[in-house]
Amino acid sequence: GGPGLEHLEFDELASAIRSEKPQYIDLSGIAKGYGVDAVARYLDSEGVGAYLVEVGGEVRTNGRKPDGTAWRLAIEQPIEQGRAVNSVVALDAQAMATSGDYRNYYESNGQRYSHTIDPETGKPIGHRLASVTVIAEDCMTADALATGFNVMGFDKAMGLATRENIPA
């Protein structure tokens, strides 16, 4: 069989994961979001009431800017060259994460391949969904959902987002 959680054995008491055969586990789909949340937790513990934390494009906010206005963030238009704003959102005690392959891909023999791997096939995703942005209460959740939605493709992702009332 191919990749998948069914090939792993989780031992919570030992904080261990075992596998009968070599497996590659990539946590990059939540790593930046986790880092943002860790910094936000620290700022909360220090009594900082208003902040914007950003790591590699993943963001979490709390409170308002010093001038009293909401934190406003641009969502980029997914274009390979240059930068352009697609839309602007105001966040208050929320997180936002984006996943996409419009800049992070590789080419081989004239074929373009996404850096995102489909867990069902073990191969790069094959659809042309360029970018997904998700807003959630915490950044690790937003990061994981954005990556998952990117893997799913537009129709499945929007169906799930609509059913679960997830801003995407």
Q: Where do the PLM segments sit?
A:
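Mature catalytic core of soluble alpha/beta enzymes
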Residues: 1-168
